[in-house]
Amino acid sequence: MPTINQLIRLGRERKVEKPKAPALQGNPQKRGVCVRVTTMTPKKPNSALRKIARVRLSNGIEVTAYIPGIGHNLQEHSVVLVRGGRVKDLPGIRYKIIRGTLDTAGVENRKQSRSKYGAKRPKK
């Protein structure tokens, strides 16, 4: 516990908060090219084959990103837009691919939460 005199002389040391998505380098999104498109199994209580892609970003950093939604059209050299945001049951995955931009198609037959999956408004 510092004395008041020490606080006047030195002040408090600020805590440095580290970024949650360091590969984006402070940008909201980054463009990248898919290097590998595979599946992964989630952590303990859950069971599935979650779709993931290894992406080389435009700044040269390679990250693993989650492909949200049902079904996708991504292949090895697809150009994608990556945003931050982790997937709770997939360890080490801190990025998501944005659907409906660049080479990524939106989710088909999506009625609710369409903007999150790049789906167009359905015809009446």
Curated annotation (Swiss-Prot):
Residues recorded as bearing 3-methylthioaspartic acid in the entry: 89
Subunit (UniProt): Part of the 30S ribosomal subunit. Contacts proteins S8 and S17. May interact with IF1 in the 30S initiation complex.
Superkingdom, natural source: Bacteria
Job description of the protein: With S4 and S5 plays an important role in translational accuracy.
Entry keywords, A to Z: Methylation, Ribonucleoprotein, Ribosomal protein, RNA-binding, rRNA-binding, tRNA-binding
Record CDD domains: Ribosomal_S12
Ranges of biased composition (kind: Basic residues): 112-124
Name of this chain's protein: Small ribosomal subunit protein uS12
